[in-house]
């Protein structure tokens, strides 16, 4: 009992003993400044901080919001422990921009929407508009719309195979080269290019030798005839395959409304103006072909005399020579830079040649109109300048036109001849002959002479070349009608003026630097 009482007294002493300035647990010290009903003071504003908490996976990461007040309110014991890991958040999915709606509508909804068009994709789709919104709808392969769209897309209205212009031309040329036995090198190298003219000439040459051997020509060479047939054949092939060139005529020809038969004794040049008359004297070698022809055709105007060097020459005085208006002040065989290069030694003979061609056209084509008969088919380019993109050459730019008289034609009896084509030459014994643009350069000893060739064909033979080319097409392709060959009408252009100076041209060089810097 005593021990129990002593223990109680010691416990009471402990209760009354304050610990470090504070009241006992059972009797805390009074707080006069605080009443039980007084509200607690306001808390300071929260300051939020962000802290990244990593997870075990390397992809996921979370952001945890931590309040500053919560940090301060934590007890020392709890502040030492790590904060609890918040629950993991699901990763946010990236939202893409929605594309056009692809929906499967019912049959009732199909009637309410408007069909815009049917696409050509596979599987097929149709693009429709509904409530102002355009959407794409998949179409089943068994849908009748899909079958109809497919048939419309591939159907050819002409029921013909779809081929290109190049393929059509190559098919025609393959048949021609096979029939007329061209060399393998010419066949393999042919690509239907504008500058490839040799194949056409070979085909026409073989055709003339096989089908028209010994064809009569008047003041024309066989080489020029086949060359012109090759040009016309190239024009037919391009017309059949619908190939067109903007700045180049493959035939090198034109239809000239010359008007040289409108007034008696007056002829016109390529400018369309009347040519002027001037005296002209020609001296030719006695042994030359031209000298002998001058003695036979003009015995009253030709005479043999000596020139200033003491040589015997045939001197032919032409008092009826005609020249272009721009060459009025130029000497013989001299042309100005504005000239067309046309010159006739005899104006009356030139007019007879134009009349002969007009009568010849009416005899060959009786249904032709008078205006069409007055249009002459003339070659603009000879072999020298008949190239795509060819630069102007020195001298004359068009073929030289020379009237040739037909000897002994006046002696024929008109009553004994029934062929109207022959009667045209009997009544008008002169032919217009087309030669190289600059035939004077052929025998010239000048070092800077321009190009020249042996191009020579008369106006009737040029028309015959066109007729033979059409005959060649009919014999080779009887099931295909002859294509239309549209030849342009001649119009004077400044690029056809006579050139006294040649333009400088460059040459190929393998080096990139000409001076090896």
Swiss-Prot record:
Residue ranges with Low complexity bias: 64-80
Gene Ontology BP terms: DNA replication; DNA-templated transcription; positive regulation of DNA replication; viral DNA genome replication; viral DNA strand displacement replication
UniProt feature, compositional bias: Basic residues: 87-96
Modification sites for Phosphotyrosine: 180
Region Disordered, residue ranges: 1-110
Pfam families membership: Viral_DNA_bi, Viral_DNA_Zn_bi
Ligand binding (Zn(2+) 1): 269, 271, 324, 340
Subcellular location: Host nucleus
Keyword Ribosomal protein listed: no
Start-end of Polar residues biased regions: 1-10
Main location: host cell
Keyword annotations from UniProtKB, A to Z: DNA replication, DNA-binding, Early protein, Host nucleus, Host-virus interaction, Metal-binding, Phosphoprotein, Viral DNA replication, Zinc
Cellular compartments per GO CC: host cell nucleus; viral capsid
Region (C-terminal arm, DBP binding) location: 501-517
InterPro entries: Ad_DBP_C_sf, ADBP_zn-bd_sf, Adenovirus_DNA-bd_a, Adenovirus_DNA-bd_N_sf, Adenovirus_DNA-bd_zn-bd, ADV_DNB2
List of residues binding Zn(2+) 2: 382, 384, 436, 453
Sequence segments annotated as region (Flexible loop): 282-316
Domain remark in the UniProt entry: The C-terminal arm bridges DBP molecules together, thereby creating a chain.
Task of the protein: Plays a role in the elongation phase of viral strand displacement replication by unwinding the template in an ATP-independent fashion, employing its capacity to form multimers. Also enhances the rate of initiation. Released from template upon second strand synthesis. Assembles in complex with viral pTP, viral pol, host NFIA and host POU2F1/OCT1 on viral origin of replication. Covers the whole ssDNA genome during synthesis. The complementary strand synthesis induces its relese from DNA template. May inhibit cellular transcription mediated by the interaction between host SRCAP and CBP.
Family, similarity comment: Belongs to the adenoviridae E2A DNA-binding protein family.
Known partners and oligomeric status: Homomultimerizes on viral ssDNA bound to pTP. Forms a initiation complex with viral polymerase, pTP and hosts NFIA and POU2F1/OCT1. Interacts with host SRCAP.
Protein name: DNA-binding protein
Species of the source: Human adenovirus B serotype 7
Gene symbol of the encoding locus: DBP
């Amino acid at each position: 009992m005593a021990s129990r009482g002593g223990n109680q007294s010691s416990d009471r002493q402990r209760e009354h003993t304050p610990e470090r300035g504070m009241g006992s647990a059972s009797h805390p010290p009074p707080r006069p400044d605080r009443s039980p009903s007084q509200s607690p003071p306001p808390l300071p504003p929260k300051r939020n901080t962000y802290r990244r908490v990593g997870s075990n996976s390397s992809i996921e990461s979370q952001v945890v919001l931590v309040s500053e007040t919560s940090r301060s309110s934590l007890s020392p014991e709890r502040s030492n422990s790590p904060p609890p890991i918040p629950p993991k958040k699901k990763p946010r999915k990236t939202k893409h921009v929605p594309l056009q709606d692809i929906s499967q509508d019912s049959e009732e909804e199909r009637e309410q929407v408007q069909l815009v068009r049917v696409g050509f994709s596979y599987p097929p789709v149709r693009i429709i508009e509904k409530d102002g919104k355009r959407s794409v709808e998949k179409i089943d392969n068994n849908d009748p719309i899909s079958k109809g769209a497919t048939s419309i897309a591939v159907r050819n209205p002409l029921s013909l195979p779809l081929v290109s212009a190049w393929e059509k031309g190559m098919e025609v040329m393959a048949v021609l080269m096979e029939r007329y036995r061209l060399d393998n090198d010419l066949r393999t190298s042919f690509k239907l290019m504008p500058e490839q003219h040799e194949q056409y000439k070979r085909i026409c040459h073989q055709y003339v030798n096989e089908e028209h051997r010994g064809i009569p020509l008047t003041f024309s060479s066989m080489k020029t005839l086949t060359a012109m047939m090759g040009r016309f054949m190239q024009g037919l092939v391009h017309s059949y395959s619908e190939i067109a060139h903007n700045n180049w005529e493959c035939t090198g020809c034109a239809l000239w409304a010359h008007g040289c038969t409108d007034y008696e004794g007056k002829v016109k040049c390529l400018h369309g103006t009347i040519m002027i008359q001037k005296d002209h004297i020609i001296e030719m070698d006695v042994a030359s072909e031209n000298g002998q022809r001058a003695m036979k055709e003009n015995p009253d105007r030709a005479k043999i005399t000596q020139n200033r060097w003491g040589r015997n020459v045939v001197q032919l005085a032409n008092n009826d020579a005609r020249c272009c208006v721009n060459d009025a002040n130029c000497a013989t065989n001299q042309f100005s830079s504005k000239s067309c290069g046309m010159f006739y030694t005899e104006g009356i003979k030139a007019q007879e040649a134009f009349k002969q061609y007009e009568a010849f056209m009416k005899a060959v084509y009786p249904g032709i109109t008078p205006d069409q008969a007055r249009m002459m088919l003339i070659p603009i380019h000879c072999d020298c300048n008949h190239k795509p993109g060819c630069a102007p050459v020195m001298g004359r730019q068009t073929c030289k036109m020379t009237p040739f008289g037909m000897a002994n034609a006046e002696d024929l009896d008109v009553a004994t001849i029934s062929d109207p084509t022959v009667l045209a030459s009997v009544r008008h014994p002169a032919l217009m002959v087309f030669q190289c643009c600059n035939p004077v350069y052929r025998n010239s000893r000048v070092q800077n002479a321009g190009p020249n060739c042996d191009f020579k064909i008369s106006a009737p033979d040029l028309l015959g070349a066109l007729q033979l080319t059409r005959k060649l097409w009919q014999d080779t392709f009887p099931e295909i009608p002859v294509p239309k060959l549209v030849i342009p009408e001649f119009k004077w252009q400044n690029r056809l003026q006579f050139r006294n100076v040649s333009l400088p041209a460059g040459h190929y060089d393998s080096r990139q630097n000409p001076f090896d810097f």
